[in-house]
From Swiss-Prot:
It comes from Salmonella typhimurium (strain LT2 / SGSC1412 / ATCC 700720). The modification N6-(pyridoxal phosphate)lysine is found at residue 252. Its cofactor is pyridoxal 5'-phosphate. PROSITE patterns: AA_TRANSFER_CLASS_3 (PS00600). One of its GO terms (molecular function) is pyridoxal phosphate binding. Catalyzes the transamination of N(2)-succinylornithine and alpha-ketoglutarate into N(2)-succinylglutamate semialdehyde and glutamate. Can also act as an acetylornithine aminotransferase. The keyword Transferase applies. This is Succinylornithine transaminase. It catalyses: N(2)-succinyl-L-ornithine + 2-oxoglutarate = N-succinyl-L-glutamate 5-semialdehyde + L-glutamate. The keyword Kinase does not apply. The gene is astC.
């Protein structure tokens, strides 16, 4: 008999690095979830841009069950068929020639930064160790990646931090140019800053970074952990910009909810990562790669990408209509189905409160800082679910605006 658990048990048993919602989801199907009490929610959070095909997608369940009936794990002393097939699919779909599998976006970014340092060390010398990242970025929670992320809140209590990491202003080429020099081994950037407020990069900014990296022989790393695998209306966001990185990191939606990450790069850069220079116990395991292979099969199609663009338009139209009614947002921005609503000054700092009220109304949304409500729904969310979910979101906005929820 299963142990009966409640939300209060989290506070009793778990390390308190999260503050979960007061309800516990127990079942999902597509873009809908149900909690322990049977209440239904429309899911516009998507596990923070992870559940690209919604919950319990039948094709993903089939792929997982099929592999689970064969074998689960074998270790990196061997390879396996699902991993090799997934690597080939990623290579065929992108600029990449080599793939490294891991378990998360943080691990993928850790591998990318280590590769950049190793490449510079081997080809130039120890002095070429500088990394340029951007303020308000987010690249993971390892000590290296949290240092690269330009949010001191996440790193300030863990000093001393890895050295030679500097932060420029995002979308400011002059700021980046002042920091990138011949001692820079890598520049790491998100094509859309997700945690930093859902801020798309400008084309000129990314093109300028590419030119600066070429000039100073630095590697350009695109962190596509949140933007990748169809989220923006292209398989990867770099395809929007006509700018090809040297290294790309991907995770989140790649597994559709099953943990997996990957670093993609070229043969030349990968060649410095000789046996023993890096590794992972579970990376590239057959369960994860079998599921991810099916995710790519479904998402990497013109129909799916066109659908993302159409759903983007539907969200924007309805959010604009909602904003005419309530006037709560100063800007609605993003790419594809990664969207952010920036709160007006009157409601500054209330993004979390809106998300909490939205959940009470039966729709799950995210935040990106205190002033931005973030949406990252499944890429196959239906028109009916968009309409129903945003109607429920409107109830939360109405409560906040009319004083049903304290704003001060």
């Amino acid at each position: 008999m299963s142990l009966s658990v409640t939300r209060e048990n989290f506070d009793e048993w778990m390390v308190p690095v999260y503050v979960p919602a007061p309800f516990i989801p127990v079942r999902g199907e597509g873009s809908r979830l149900w909690d322990q009490q049977g209440k239904e929610y429309i899911d516009f959070a998507g596990g923070i841009a992870v559940n690209a095909l919604g919950h319990a997608h039948p094709a993903l369940r089939e792929a997982l069950n099929e592999q689970a009936n064969r074998f689960w794990h074998i270790g990196n002393g061997y390879t396996n068929e699902p991993a090799l097939r997934l690597a080939k699919k990623l290579i065929d779909a992108t600029f990449a020639e080599r793939v490294f599998f891991c378990n998360s976006g943080a691990e993928a970014n850790e591998a990318a930064l280590k590769l950049a340092r190793k490449y510079a060390h081997d080809r130039v010398g120890n002095h070429k160790s500088g990394i340029v990242a951007f303020k308000n970025a987010f690249h993971g929670r390892t000590l290296f990646t949290v240092s690269a992320g330009g949010q001191p809140t996440y790193s300030q209590d863990f000093a001393p931090l890895p050295p030679d990491i500097r932060h420029a202003a995002y979308n400011d080429l002059n700021s980046a140019s002042a920091l990138i020099d011949d001692n820079t081994c890598a520049v790491i950037v998100e094509p859309v800053q997700g945690e930093g407020g859902v801020i798309p990069a400008t084309k000129a900014f990314l093109q300028g970074l590419r030119e600066l990296c070429d000039r100073h022989q630095a590697l350009l790393i695109f962190d596509e952990v949140q933007t990748g695998v169809g989220r923006t209306g292209e398989l990867y966001a770099y395809m929007h910009y006509g700018v090809t990185p040297d290294i790309l990191t991907t995770a989140k939606a790649l597994g559709g909810g099953f943990p997996i990450g990957a670093m993609l790069t070229t043969q030349d850069y990968a060649s410095v990562m000789t046996p023993g220079t890096h590794g992972t116990t579970y990376g590239g395991n057959p369960l994860a790669t079998a599921v991810a292979g099916k995710v790519l099969d479904i998402i990497n199609t013109p129909e799916m990408q066109n659908g993302v663009r159409q759903r983007h338009d539907a969200f924007i139209e309805r959010l604009n209509t909602l904003n005419v009614r309530f006037g709560m947002f100063s800007e609605i921005r993003g790419l594809g189905l990664l969207l952010g609503c920036v709160l007006q000054t009157e409601f500054a700092g209330k993004a979390k409160l809106i998300a909490q009220e939205a959940a009470k109304a039966g729709v799950m949304v995210l935040i990106a800082g205190g002033d931005v409500v973030r949406f990252a729904p499944a890429l196959n969310v239906s028109d009916e679910e968009i309409a129903t979910g945003l109607d429920r979101f409107a109830l939360a906005c109405e409560r906040l605006q009319t004083g049903g929820v304290p704003c001060g």
